[in-house]
Structure formats: C-alpha cells, structure tokens
Amino acid sequence: MIRVAINGYGRIGRSILRALYESGKRQQIQIVAINELAKPEAIIHLTQYDTTHGRFQPRVKLVDGQMQIGDDTIKIFHEPDPAKLPWRELDIDIVYEATGAILDRQSCEAHIHAGAKQVLISHPSSADVDGTIVYGVNHDLLRAEHTVVSNASCTTNCIVPVIDVLDKHFGVKSGAITTIHSAMNDQQVIDAYHDDLRRTRAAGQSIIPVDTKLARGIERILPHMKDKFEAISVRVPTINVTAIDLSVTLDKTVDIATVNQVLELAANGRFNGILGYTDEPLVSCDFNHDPRSSIVDGTQTRVSAGQLVKLLLWCDNEWGFANRMLDTSLAMIAAKQS
C-alpha cells in the first residue's frame, strides 16, 4: 500500500482524492494526510460538494479535526512550511505537491527533508527535477533514484499522446496549437487587480488570451520536437473541460480517414484509458468527469493539401489530470521497487 499526502487541497488536490476512490485504486494508494491552510469545515464541505463534479458519494465527516471517509481517517494539517510537516512519522511514500506554488527541486526537497520519500508535482516544474512525465508516453523513464518528478500540465497530457502517435506513423515537421481553456482560479469573478492586465477582467464575460508554455512542455517530453511547435491559449467562460486546436504538418501525405483510423486504433490499443476517440456530435460538457487525458473529436479532423492536418482534442483539465497523478505515482513506486 502506497502512503501519500496531499500538499495543497484546491481543485487538483480534491480531484485527486475523489478520483482515488472512484477509480478503484484505493486498494493500492492510501491518502494519509492533507496539508491545507483553509479551515477544516471548508475542506470537508468542498470534498463532499463540488459544483463541477457533483456530490462525492462516500460520506465525508470531520471527526476530532480529521477527515473521515468511511473507515478511512485522513489527518489534516495547516502548516505553511513543508519542512515542518510530519512526513517521517507518518511514513509518507509520495507527496502530491498540489499548491501550484512549489515548482522547483529545492522547494520540493523540503518534503524530502521532512521525511517523504518522493514528491510528484501537479504542475509544470523547473528543469532541475528528476523528470517530467506524461503517463503513457514516457513514464518508462522513471528510475528508482528519482525523488522529485513533475506530472507536466493537463494540456501537455492532452496533446503529447496525440503528437506521439502522429509522429510515429506519419512524421511531424511542425505544429501550431490553440488551447481553449476553461476559466481558472487565477482569474477574477468581476474586474479586479492582477499583474496580468488581461486577467484583471471578469472571467465570465470575456474570452481572455493568456500566456502558455505548452510548446516548451512538449519539447521536455519529446526532445526531438524542439522548436517545432508554437502555442497560444485563451480562457473561456466555462468552469471545466478544455479544447485544443492542433495543426500539424506531416512528412507523409494522408487523408482524414487515415488519420482518424490511426488515432482510434491508438486509443483502443497502446493508449487505452489515456487517449479516447469519438465521432459523436458532442460538446464540452459531455467530457466533464472524463478520466482520460485526451479525446480526439474525429468529426472535426481536417486535411489540407495532404500534409497539413487540423485536429480538435478534448480533455477534462481537472479530472483527467488527477487520474494521471494517480497513475504516475504508481509508476514511480514501481520504478523504485524494480
């Protein structure tokens, strides 16, 4: 049984906990502790009730300052300094670092000094970590000595499996990406101050361009794609599910049917459970609570002049990513035991 702690219990932290119980992985992973500065009553309430993902079916209670889910008791801490957390006493194997603020090796090593054996960051990190993993593509690179690992981003997890499939079958020369991302909690409900002037504006009233490092994230997973991709991102007034408009120029000449067939076969084969394929006339809310990293919308595939291919990909940017956090942590332990 893997003993884990969650540091930072926001959208991703809570999704990880709920995904653990819904995915059937509870027999492999035990959440021992949560560190979150919010009040315990709010922690319990937002675990039980969620606007995006609905009510959590197991009853969640606050008992003597701890979270209780069925027979499971999870300790709650409110410690701002990770180095002071009792990970050694709790025998923590992996910390899910989900604050969104601790992104480099030195900061993550506070968890190691506190007694945790490994750290998995739920965010793109600095380059000094032991590895950045997109599960299904490069998790085989994990090694026993790796202590600090990044799970990349939700959009990197969405797009990299597709690029990998296209490159292996047809060769990818270059690409351009537009991420159409649901609003996030770094935006404003009504106009308010922010360092990014576009993010001073009300999230529910505008399509808002934001900076993205997605192209660099692709390079970290697929180094041979260096300088081949560029990306832009806009935030839209929905609370969950993201679409990615991917355009790639291929080495080989293809048609729509060939591209879709290759992607559908990959979804049913090597990337089963990670990549999906649909030819139904669906909209973004149909992918809410989908545990896969990416779903190809085959109805939107286009080919121009035989080599320029445009794809539409969907992902639940919370739920899919939370499920990959679980998968990557299991892969980290497997590598450590090999």
Curated annotation (Swiss-Prot):
Gene3D superfamilies: Dihydrodipicolinate Reductase, domain 2, NAD(P)-binding Rossmann-like Domain. Keywords: Cytoplasm, NAD, Oxidoreductase, Pyridoxine biosynthesis. The keyword 4Fe-4S does not apply. Its main location: cytoplasm. Substrate binds at S153, C154, T155, R199, T212, K213, R235. One of its GO terms (cellular component) is cytosol. The record marks H181 as: Activates thiol group during catalysis. Pathway: Cofactor biosynthesis; pyridoxine 5'-phosphate biosynthesis; pyridoxine 5'-phosphate from D-erythrose 4-phosphate: step 1/5. InterPro entries: E4P_DH_bac, GlycerAld/Erythrose_P_DH, GlycerAld_3-P_DH_AS, GlycerAld_3-P_DH_cat, GlycerAld_3-P_DH_NAD(P)-bd, NAD(P)-bd_dom_sf. GO terms for biological process: glucose metabolic process; pyridoxal phosphate biosynthetic process; pyridoxine biosynthetic process. Its EC number is 1.2.1.72. HAMAP family: E4P_dehydrog. This is D-erythrose-4-phosphate dehydrogenase. It comes from Shewanella oneidensis (strain ATCC 700550 / JCM 31522 / CIP 106686 / LMG 19005 / NCIMB 14063 / MR-1).
